[in-house]
């Protein structure tokens, strides 16, 4: 698959964030992609009014897609941007308001959305989120092998199930245990769906014997952990303000009876160990497969890891974290 070259590269060390042995890049088409996604959102009537559209735009969803997939073709970047917009709308629906603490309603909604995505039930096209999700699904179905669509849908399913787990916890006012949280965070972040989208940068999606190999699975797990843990770090201020307990720092503070600052330090240590582990796994992968496609996939994983942090810093989610530590630690 052809790709557009990136035009923006940032240093390997972003002030205030985490260090990586690889640099972040941004797709040069992000502004055009954003305008096309906003037009798509309006055309499908995914939001009710201009205020909601402005709120969606403020999330910098297209910039996230551009930082995660800097070498994508224009078509793949547009798909990722549109999917990210729908995912952010889903996050708002599940995490805010009465639904966030109503597991019975979440379970009903999950059955509805998953039934529609997998084609088990007739789609309710009056639901804007249904319209958005099915549009993304159909574009994948038309352009890529069915086995890839099923892989992506299976990982998307985990996201819905994790939302039910979170709603149950909120209703019970329960902070999850560390090991449980580490497992479920991989699903609540929907990162596996983006690991799948990275395969669209290759000539063909990875075959089963490759994608299910323990080494490649470890690569994807590490990528998932790093993205989710750094997101927990950057969104800590907002989530503490909202009383959200599904955050690794909050879980660490609760499990270890530590201060907030100590929990942050532990997250950073866990993060750095995962980065070091990735470097070792990467060497094993390249020793096993002398394949340009595998190397391209690893390059894409690294770009996504570094790009996720760059987007978070660009979006301003880091501001005020130090003062928050002083207040809450």
UniProtKB/Swiss-Prot annotation:
Write one Gene Ontology MF term: terpene synthase activity
What gene makes this protein? geoA
Matching entries from SUPFAM superfamilies are given as: Terpenoid synthases
Question: Catalyzes what?
Answer: (2E,6E)-farnesyl diphosphate = (+)-eremophilene + diphosphate
Cofactor(s) needed: Mg(2+)
Q: So where does Mg(2+) 1 get bound?
A: 91, 96
Residues at which substrate binds: 185, 238, 317-318
Query: Which free-text remark accompanies the cofactor?
Result: Binds 3 Mg(2+) ions per subunit.
* Chain positions recorded as Mg(2+) 2 binding sites: 96
Say what the protein does.
Catalyzes the conversion of (2E,6E)-farnesyl diphosphate (FPP) to yield the bicyclic sesquiterpene eremophilene via a 1,10-cyclization, which requires the abstraction of the pyrophosphate from FPP to yield the (E,E)-germacradienyl cation. The only accepted substrate is farnesyl diphosphate (FPP).
Please give the name of this protein: (+)-eremophilene synthase
Q: What is known of its domains?
A: The Asp-Asp-Xaa-Xaa-Asp (DDXXD) motif is important for the catalytic activity, presumably through binding to Mg(2+).
Where along the sequence does the record place the motif called DDXXD motif?
91-95
Give the GO biological process terms. Answer: terpenoid biosynthetic process
Q: Which EC number applies?
A: 4.2.3.164
Which species is this UniProt entry from? Sorangium cellulosum (strain So ce56) (Polyangium cellulosum (strain So ce56))
Main EC class of this protein?
A: lyase
What residues does Mg(2+) 3 bind to?
Answer: 231, 235, 239
Task: State the family named in the UniProt similarity comment for this chain.
Answer: Belongs to the terpene synthase family.
């Amino acid at each position: 698959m052809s790709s557009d070259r990136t035009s923006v590269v940032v240093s390997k060390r972003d002030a205030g964030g985490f260090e990586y042995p690889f640099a972040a890049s941004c797709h040069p088409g992000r502004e055009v992609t954003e305008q096309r996604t906003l037009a798509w959102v309006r055309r499908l009537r995914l939001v009710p009014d201009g205020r909601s559209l402005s709120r969606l735009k403020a999330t910098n969803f297209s910039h996230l897609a551009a930082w995660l997939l800097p070498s994508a073709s224009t078509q793949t970047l547009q798909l990722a941007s549109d999917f990210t917009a729908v995912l952010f709308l889903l996050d708002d629906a599940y995490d805010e308001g009465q639904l966030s603490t109503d597991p019975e309603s979440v379970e009903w909604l999950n059955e509805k959305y998953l039934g529609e995505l997998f084609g088990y039930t007739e789609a309710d096209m009056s639901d804007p989120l249904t319209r958005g999700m099915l549009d993304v699904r159909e574009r994948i179905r038309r352009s890529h092998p069915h086995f890839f669509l099923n892989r992506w849908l299976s990982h998307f399913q985990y996201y819905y199930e994790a939302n039910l787990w979170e709603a149950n916890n909120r209703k019970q006012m329960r902070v999850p245990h560390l090991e449980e949280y580490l497992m479920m965070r991989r699903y609540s972040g929907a990162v596996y769906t983006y690991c799948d989208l990275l395969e669209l940068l290759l000539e063909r999606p990875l075959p089963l014997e490759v994608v299910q190999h323990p080494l490649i699975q470890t690569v994807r797990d590490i990528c998932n952990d790093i993205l989710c843990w750094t997101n927990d770090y950057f969104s800590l201020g907002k989530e503490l303000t909202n009383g959200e307990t599904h955050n690794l720092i909050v879980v660490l503070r609760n499990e270890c009876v530590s201060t907030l600052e100590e929990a942050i330090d532990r997250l950073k240590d866990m993060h750095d160990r995962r980065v070091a582990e990735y470097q070792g796994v990467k060497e094993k992968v390249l020793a096993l497969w002398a394949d340009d496609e595998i190397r391209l996939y690893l390059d894409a994983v690294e770009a996504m890891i570094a790009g996720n942090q760059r987007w978070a810093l660009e979006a301003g989610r880091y501001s005020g974290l130090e003062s928050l530590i002083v207040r809450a630690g």
